[in-house]
Amino acid sequence: RALVGVLGEKGRGVFQVTVGPGLTTEVMESLAADNNCPVFQTAALYNDAFPDRAPKMVTDSAEAQARGNQLWAQVSCQPLTMDFALPAAFPMQSLDAWAPLINADNESFERKIRDAEFRHRFRHDLETPQKGKLFFGDWSKVEVAMAVREENREFEGLTVAEMAERQGKDPVDAFFDLSAEEGLETVYTAGLMNSNEDEVEKLMQQPGSLISLSDGGAHLRYLCDAGYGLHLLGHWVRER
């Protein structure tokens, strides 16, 4: 509050923060009201596992505006996607089963992902929705972006679900088997949130939302969404 209070004292500036358990919409609105400044809460991304979260952020922001307070929910016009190989699989790191792998060397890592008990715990985590998780086991949204071995290039461009069906395997087994076979160098692309375009369109059209959310370079190891302006014009304006 002291930080945002400076904006109120100076009568200029905006405040933006990624919200969490301690930063509710009520708190964010009070910051806007107390300092008469625009406040942006991030990020209202549609998540199939928690379908009410993003719409509520947008609706709450619109209601705050109706009360005369400058609160907006930042939304994105494109899916949140990440590229990763297993040793740096950020989408999986929130899973309890993944904890032993975070600082493991490649040899230990590969041995672990081949272990049947590890795969059992991994499946269990995927089937247990909880806040903070990015991936919930929808293998139709994880694609093989780059295979290392020539004999595996046929899988590039396929989702893990499609690859598993072609191999007659469970998707979890297909996912780990390919990476283990390729020395953990296989690169995947995962569509994590905001991939349901019908729901994304609703968020963008609400008065409480602001199409402004992108990642212009803070996490280049995983993603770069800096082209969201062109995606907005090319996909949503021209194509949709």
Where are these regions (language model features)?
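Divalent metal-binding pocket/active-site signature
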Residues: R1-G5, R12-G22
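Polyanionic/metal-chelating signatures
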Residues: L7-G8, L23, E29-S214, H219, ...
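Structural recognition of the beta-strand scaffold that forms the well-ordered cores
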Residues: Q16, I211-S212, H235
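Generic long, charged, amphipathic alpha-helical segments
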Residues: G216, L223-C224, G229, G234-R240
